[in-house]
Amino acid sequence: MEGAMTEPGKEMTHLDARGRLRMVDVSGKERTAREARAEATVEVSPETLTRISEGTIAKGNVYEAARIAGIMAAKRTWELIPLCHPLQVTGVEIEFSADPARNEIRILSRVKTLDRTGVEMEALVAAAHAGLTIYDMCKAVDRGIVIRDIRLLYKSGGKSGTFERA
């Protein structure tokens, strides 16, 4: 796998010269302000969306449970994703917006740090885990829930600069 490429001129940093996985050594990098934002979309039935907004799901407040789950997941990403570094997460925000016309809930996560590597994975894990928690909170009334479109929207800081999804 030597020279494995994702984009011209960019190598897979988690592979050594023989193609073996390794955790990238970031000890020589400076701590810099970094931020990442991600999203996930949860499709639910119209009845489920109404029950969530009215607060009548038996397990409790769906959005607050999902918010806490997303925050907790961001802080523990290094335990969930192999080769992720443990980071000093300095802030996590999780927001929800319901779209009754599409029977969807959009989850937006924002994660910040002052560290040696980025928080893209933390933002993605936060959004995904919030979506999984919505599923768990609502599965008794809606088995057809779909979690989709988990993706990075924005990242800043570090050597690779800023990325913003168009």
Swiss-Prot record:
The keyword Lipid biosynthesis does not apply. GO terms for molecular function: cyclic pyranopterin monophosphate synthase activity. This is Cyclic pyranopterin monophosphate synthase. The active site is at D136. The keyword Lyase applies. The gene is moaC. Its EC number is 4.6.1.17. Belongs to the MoaC family. InterPro entries: MoaC, MoaC_bact/euk, MoaC_sf, MoCo_biosynth_MoaA/MoaC, Mopterin_CF_biosynth-C_dom. It comes from Syntrophobacter fumaroxidans (strain DSM 10017 / MPOB). Substrate binds at L83, C84, H85, M121, E122. It catalyses: (8S)-3',8-cyclo-7,8-dihydroguanosine 5'-triphosphate = cyclic pyranopterin phosphate + diphosphate. It comes from the Bacteria. Signal peptide: none annotated. Coiled coil: none annotated. Homohexamer; trimer of dimers. GO terms for biological process: Mo-molybdopterin cofactor biosynthetic process. Catalyzes the conversion of (8S)-3',8-cyclo-7,8-dihydroguanosine 5'-triphosphate to cyclic pyranopterin monophosphate (cPMP). Keywords: Lyase, Molybdenum cofactor biosynthesis.
